[in-house]
């Protein structure tokens, strides 16, 4: 089940919210846990046992680590932590990376080891990282172990962020899990945030995604530069509005349930460097890798050679986290190398450059990076890059057709990547009486919702890209 589906909007969502607010406060976490497991089982019934096992395993590990720390048995606590990390990474590796490893060995050694062909459990990368952050923080003493299995299960399985994030660290919601207070204002803000996210997904991401699919289906060996750039720009818009739209919906649903999740995006395409970009894009993932991998490796506290090694490790892992294909590793290393270059050589020159140059530099590298991300075959990546830089001509009739039929959509997408729409709306509303502000907001959200429903009824194209990870 996805948020941008009629089943969720008109069946699951009203049922969950209605019963949630009718439940006594003491039973609300239990209701959320049960409905979150139902939400997960709707699309992955076979892996509901894996989810339950993950909850139980990490719950017991957290209690065990805390008990051993309290008794000052630090070596045993560390051993249990290592076991917990190995168990989580082992499960993730089995389902996500086993066939990649087997296929690579077969290609190199000429062997014929049978692939496992295990279906990837939806959201396993997200909920595994949440569980790991919890147990590591218990070991560090940052948070207390959660003794209530229902509360812990709710943290891991909470449906708004279960299958595509944001990656919610336990320490950011520890108090909210037990003592949240829902308010009318918070619920209203949640509806607005959810509706904006739904609009991003259905009205923009799905539409520009169709343009990317059209271009990606063309032979890369005869693609004109203009068409190739149109496709790459379309995918750049698609993945942003797809993923940030999902994050908006997750944050909005959280608000309706009394939770305040941290932001996951901050206008990343306005960045003036790649370093800044990764502070604005998928913030929860970057924070996770910084706190649980980069800093433990030494971070910036060691010499430059070690810092470079740390960055290569972190960005290689970041790439592989996104998928079981070598293009994701290449994509991660691509950014790792750029970040190293910026850190060592480009930081000061970039700061002195005009703002427009900084932004064009960043956007160019971001768009090229998404080409590596989108195409799993190295040969296809090479052909597409050749097309981008004019190997098969500049523009052709197809370029002009795709441009003229999609120009309005692309301009809307570009504008929606900026702060201007929010600033313009706020400036307009600030001039009106409070009652008029409320009325206009309600009318706007209703219009967006109606348009989304109309598109969902008539359009079968509704993928969430990050569900693959």
Regions found by a protein language model. Give the residues of each.
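Membrane-embedded transmembrane alpha-helical bundles that form the catalytic cores
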Residues: 1-468
